[in-house]
Structures are given as structure tokens and as C-alpha cells.
Amino acid sequence: QFVYQLRTQLVKQILDTPVAQVDHLGSAPLMASLSTDIQALTTAFVRMPELVQGIILSLAVSLYLGSLSWPLLLIIMLWIVTTIWISTLLVKHVYQNLTHIRDINDALYQDYQAVIEGRKELALNQHRAKNLYIQDLIRHATAYKKTIIKADTYHLSAVNWSNIMMFAAIGVIFAVASYLGLSLGIATTFALTLLFMQSPILHAVGAYPTLQTAQVALDKIQSLQLADYEPQFVTANTDNNWQSIELRNLDYQYSSQDMILKQVNLTLNKGDVVFLIGANGSGKSTLAKVLTGIFTPTRGQLSIDGRPITDTNRAEYRQLFSAIFSDQYIFKQLIGPEGNPPDMSLVHHWQHRLQLQNKVSIEGSKLSTDKLSQGQRKRLAMLTTVVEDKDILLLDEWAADQDPAFRRTFYQSLIPELKALGKTLFIISHDDSYFEHADRLLLMKQGKLIELNPEQRKQASADAISML
């Protein structure tokens, strides 16, 4: 139950953590925590009874031996405490090495991610593949091997030291018993009892590094600084009666980097079809994430119908949007408005409008796909977002991966259809041939936002590159 709660709570915390923070962490540390750290805590939870059993038996046996001879018990306890103290010094090195191993694990997960996600690029460049394999993977794997050997060496040293001292304690028992004038029977009872206790004590010592590994895992999870655990999701119904969204004197900055957005002012009216153009790196995608509430402005104000968007209502505000970003993840489960089952007639309509009827099959409300091109994947993402039936649809260079014929269909046919359905469209685009289909044309230039007047729009349509 403990491990179940930890796993589910960790996933919920990731869901509730601001996207910018998760992006900064990267997927490798999160995957390492969800796999390696959870596994370490699971193992520790299984080994915990051994430690508890060893402690309880030691206390019970101590009371029994104390009834036979307190002086002899105190001397043996001093012997055992000394043994444990030295073992603890050895185990301290185990903990230090386990902490280092956990850091190496993060690096290894990054290497695995590079090998899997960069497989096409690596296949085309064997020099890069060799460098990744030798300079990164082999180096990290070697560091892991050496560090785990060190940790195991200290652990085995602690176990062997405990074994030797426990057997030596038997000789001490008979020597001290003779010195104190105790009977041979009492000395034999002490010796046999100590031999009986050897296994539980060694099991407890063996379980201790596992518990230390779990402590390292907990420390690593806490170092992620994820959002506090909240069992509930935002369930408030979306208010579709909004009229305008305003950005006033808005700045955004990634941690200690230069300002990405500078004094941005924008009013987005319901039903608008807005195109945003600009050079690569000008801040277009960042503006999109701030507008949708995914990123929190560094300065300035985001508001809807005059109501400021704050931490208390930002999650509810985000429910107004469906978005397709450049790194869109496609979920196979289709979801309709407010999380209800999708309208299948709407699904099939858009499946045909997006020319996916021969590429994607739909079983129930789940997508079943063969291999799709990048452009077809973007169309599939469009299908999943349209059936959500959100008020605002944001598309980040969605048409860039479409062939010329379907790009024309998108601008000349799909955009008017979505507008007729009452959707507000915010589209990041470089397609200067289709700027006339926008109600408004915005230009992002070096972090600043400019709305183009009719004359500037003509120039942008004639030669978009010169405007950037």
C-alpha cells in the first residue's frame, strides 16, 4: 500500500508541477525516479521486517541474558556496540557511494534516451554514435561499475567484520565468565544464545544498506521539488461565455536567461482568427505557452474579461484551450467536452475532413494507427483536439509538415469551418501565401509583439522573410 501510494502520488505531483519546471528537469531524472527510486523503496519496504525482527529479538534476548548475569551482558553489549559502531563507519561509505550511483543513474537514463530517440540520426552518423557510446555510455557505465564495486566492498566488509566479531564474542563470553566466577552453564547459555542471534543480527545489518538506498531514493525524489500532492483534479466546468483575453505589459524569462518576452500587450477576442509570425527564436512558442496558461508570466498580467489569472484559477483557465505544439504527444483515447465520451459523428466527420479514414481506425473511442508520416501525425493530433470541443484552438506551426495540397485545404477550408463553429483560432505560421485568411496578423520580433496594419499585412504577404 505504501509503495502504491508513493507511485501514484509521484505521478500526480508531476501532473500538478508547472510545465516549465518539468521541462527544466527533463524526462531522464523523472523516469529514473519513477523506476529506479520506486524500485529501491519497494525493496526497502520488503526488507524492513528483517531489521524490525532483529531489533525485537535483540531486546528480548537481552532481557533474558540480563536475568542470568547483568555484568556479563553489559560487557557483551559493549562488545556488540563497538562492532556495530565500526560497521556503521563502513556502511557510511556505502551510503556515499549509493548517492553517487543514483546520480550516475540519471546520466545513464539520458544516454538511453539519446540512443532510443536519436536512433535515426545515429544510424546516419557512425562518428556521433561512436562518441555517444564511448564518451558517454561507456564512461557512465564504467563509473557505475566502479562505484557499485566500492559500495559492495564496504558492505561486505561490514558483514564480514560483524561475523568475525560475533564469533570472537563467544571466546570473550567464556573468558569473562571465568573471570567473574560464573558457572559453565551460564557461559554456555550466553554463547548458544549469541549464536542463535547471529542470523537475525546479520540479516538486520544486511538490510541496512537497502534502507540507505531507499533514503537516497527519497532524497532524490524530494530534490525534484515537485508540486505538493493534491488528490483532486480541477473539475469546474469551463465558462464559455468569455469575451476577451488580455495580456498587459507581460514579460517572460527562463530562469536566469535573457528575457524572452518583453512588454507584450495583446487582446484576444472571442471568435478571432489570429496568425502569429516571426523569426525562429523570436518568442512565438513561448508566447503561446504563456497565453494558454502553461507558463506563468515573470511580470505583467494575464486576464480574462478583466479577471486576473492567478495560481488559484490558472488550471481552470487552461481548460479553455486545445493546443498542438511542435512536440505534440498523441493520446490514443479520444475525449469529448468536459471529459465525456466523444461525439462519434463529429469524430468520423473530422476523420474524413483530415483525410485519415484510410490511415486510422477507431475502435470504440480509441485510435488504432499504423505508421504515419509527420504530417499525418499532426492531422491525427488535430482530430484529438477538435473532438475535445474547446473554445480556443492554438496551433504551433501545424501546417509546416503538411503537403502543399493539404496545406491549402487547411487554410482555405478547415479554418473557415472551425471559425463557423465559433472557435477562436491562434495560429503560429510562416505561410505568407495564406495570411489573408487571418482576421489579425501579429509579428513577434526579438521578444516584442506588434500587430500589423493593413499596409504592413500586404507587405508581409508579399515578402514575409523581409519582415522578420
Residue positions per predicted region:
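Primarily ABC-family ATPase nucleotide-binding module
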Residues: 128-130, 225-275, 279, 460
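A hydrophobic transmembrane-helix motif
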Residues: 50-91, 147-194
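ABC ATPase nucleotide-binding domain helical subdomain, centered on the C-loop/LSGGQ "ABC signature"
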Residues: 318, 332-367, 412
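An intracellular "coupling" helix at the cytosolic face of ABC transporter transmembrane type-1 domains
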Residues: 19, 36-44, 97, 114, ...
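Conserved ABC transporter NBD signature motif
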Residues: 300-308, 317
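Short intracellular "coupling" helices and adjacent cytoplasmic loop segments at the cytosolic face
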Residues: 8-32, 36-38, 111-135, 225-234
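Helix-to-loop junction immediately C-terminal to a conserved catalytic motif
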Residues: 292
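Cytosolic ends of transmembrane helices, especially the final helix of ABC transmembrane type-1 domains
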Residues: 153, 197-229, 233-234
